[in-house]
């Protein structure tokens, strides 16, 4: 599932969703790309 990284820009309608939702923590070789902390899922982007 795609998600919006902070680097995608603030406008949800015009932003490109370059992140991927990952349950719990991001996989190896990926990093969390949003500052917002959620206990269940993170928005991750490939390093």
UniProtKB/Swiss-Prot annotation:
Disulfide bonds join 3-43, 5-33, 26-44. It comes from the Eukaryota. GO terms for cellular component: extracellular region; nematocyst. Belongs to the sea anemone sodium channel inhibitory toxin family. Type II subfamily. This is Delta-halcutoxin-Hcg1a. Is potently lethal to crabs, although it showed neither lethal activity in mice nor hemolytic activity. May bind to voltage-gated sodium channels (Nav), thereby delaying their inactivation during signal transduction. Keywords: Disulfide bond, Ion channel impairing toxin, Nematocyst, Neurotoxin, Secreted, Toxin, Voltage-gated sodium channel impairing toxin. GO terms for biological process: regulation of signal transduction. It is found in: Secreted; Nematocyst. One of its GO terms (molecular function) is toxin activity.
